A protein has these predicted regions:
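Accessory nucleic-acid engagement/destabilization modules that flank
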Residues: 1-159
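Conserved Walker A/P-loop ATP-binding site and its immediately adjacent core
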Residues: 220-244, 253-256, 354
Length: 377
């Protein structure tokens, strides 16, 4: 995306100022180096990039209003702020505006523009963190290097192969649900789905089967499994680890601890700790709180992962437990991800909540379809 490229090129132009260069030589003066880039991006009529640049250290700011004074921390306030002269940046940095436009799939409404700004912000802050990490370390951090999703799909197929010749009625029903999910994953287009499976119907593995088959068929990047309670997350994560391998499954919630038990650095734990920062793992198991609060956060550390939610399959387990008081922003977020960011979302439960009217109202371009009709009994 050219707006992301523009944000990357302009975000640190304030460091060209004499004051900041003095700081590099040991001066203790404090220099605001992000406002200059935000002002330049806004001058170039790129407000989303201006928001991202302004907040890449301190947090995504409120927009405020054109009447805000220069001392206000809002974007409009900072656009009026006097900055240290730094014009020499233009000798080395020459951003191109020929294609720096909002992507066509982003609707021209406030919510869509806000989500696009957050995604742009996520790209910028994650790239900035990674670039700083690479500069400060003497060797590359142990990131990436995961098995491709196609390999994980084969691991799953090997795991379920003995199940496909069921010996009793219950197992035949489970097998039917599993096979339907595999077929749907390969054949269905990206979109919004429900998976209504009775208790004991093998919902966890069947939903994983759909997700991996779908991700491979549509060249998606990862599978994200969103669970409402930490009390049930460990069991799901253990199931996935037993099938796909511990190294390929990232469990991220308040109770997940990746600190080493002694002074020695555990390479596997450290790798997972790094992955919690930006969700670059192939399979992620997280909580609804972590997922939705990150989508609506303004802090760089929480927002780093957002761009890695794009181009994914997201399974919402026990969707009927989405809190009523937060239902509107949750549904709006799911709608944005599916409509604009190549996310396939599955609402997975034994008893579907009545979300169809909300999605029809908030995301009218989406149609909600059941993956396994006639399996409720």
């Amino acid at each position: 995306d050219e707006q992301a490229r523009l944000a990357g090129m302009l975000h640190d132009i304030g460091k060209y100022s004499v004051a900041f260069q003095s700081r590099l030589q040991g001066s203790s003066c404090t220099v605001d180096h992000s406002t200059a880039g935000a002002q330049e991006a806004f001058r170039l009529r790129q407000p989303e990039a201006a928001f991202a640049i302004a907040g890449h250290h301190s947090g995504l700011p409120d927009g405020g209003s054109s009447t805000d004074r220069s001392e206000r921390p809002t974007l409009f306030g900072r656009l009026k702020k006097a900055v240290e002269p730094c014009e020499t940046w233009s000798r080395e940095v020459q951003p191109s505006l020929s294609s720096a436009k909002r992507p066509a799939q982003i609707a021209p409404d406030n919510l869509s523009e806000a989500f696009y700004t957050r995604m742009l912000y996520s790209c910028l802050v994650d790239a900035d963190f990674l670039d700083t990490e690479a500069f400060m370390r003497e060797e590359p951090a142990p990131r990436g290097g995961y098995a491709p999703l196609s390999d994980l799909f084969q691991k799953l197929r090997q795991h379920i192969a003995p199940w496909l010749n069921p010996s009793n009625a219950l197992n035949r029903k489970r097998c039917e649900i599993l096979q339907r999910c595999l077929d749907a994953g390969r054949e269905r287009p990206a979109g919004l789905y429900t998976l209504t499976v009775p208790t004991g119907g093998g919902k966890t593995v069947s939903s994983l089967a759909f997700a991996l088959a779908h991700a491979v068929a549509h060249n998606l990047s990862r599978v994200i499994y969103v669970i409402p309670y930490t009390s049930i997350i460990d069991q799901t994560a253990d199931t996935f680890r037993s099938i796909l391998g511990d190294e390929n499954v990232l469990e991220h919630h308040s109770g997940a601890d990746y600190s080493a038990s002694d002074d020695a650095v555990d390479a596997a734990l450290y790798r997972k700790s790094l992955a919690t920062e930006n969700w670059d793992a192939p399979v992620i198991v997280t909580t609804a709180v972590q997922f939705f609060e990150s989508l609506y956060s303004n802090r760089p550390s929480r927002c780093r992962k957002l761009h890695n939610i794009a181009n994914s399959v997201v399974i919402f387990d026990e969707a009927q437990t989405l809190p009523v008081h937060s239902l509107l922003p949750c549904v709006e977020a799911i709608g944005q991800l599916v409509q604009s960011y190549r996310v396939t979302a599955v609402l997975c439960t034994a008893t579907q909540p009545a979300l169809q009217p909300l999605f029809a109202q908030l995301a009218p371009r989406l149609s909600m379809q059941e993956l396994c009709p006639d399996t409720s009994s």
